[in-house]
Amino acid sequence: MGRIRQTFIKRTGEELIEKFADKFTSDFEENKKAVEEVAMISTKTLRNRIAGYVTAKVKKMNA
């Protein structure tokens, strides 16, 4: 069983995918930089969790 992500992470990730779909790929490192560019995220941990969620969503969409 996987970990359940917080609603804030899911909501933020979904909004970023809707607005900036062309910036995100299936590569976590690139998504980390993209999240930092387009969103005002206060902590590194939160940025990484959102980038991880976006990466997983992009991989599911492309599969």
UniProtKB/Swiss-Prot annotation:
GO molecular-function term, one example from the UniProt record: structural constituent of ribosome
Transmembrane segments annotated in the record for this chain: none
Pfam assignment, any one: Ribosomal_S17e
Stored InterPro entries: Ribosomal_eS17 (IPR001210), Ribosomal_eS17_CS (IPR018273), Ribosomal_eS17_sf (IPR036401)
GO CC, alphabetical: cytosol; ribonucleoprotein complex; ribosome
One of the GO BP terms on file: translation
Keywords: Ribonucleoprotein, Ribosomal protein
Top-rank taxon: Archaea
Family the UniProt entry places it in: Belongs to the eukaryotic ribosomal protein eS17 family.
Name of this chain's protein: Small ribosomal subunit protein eS17
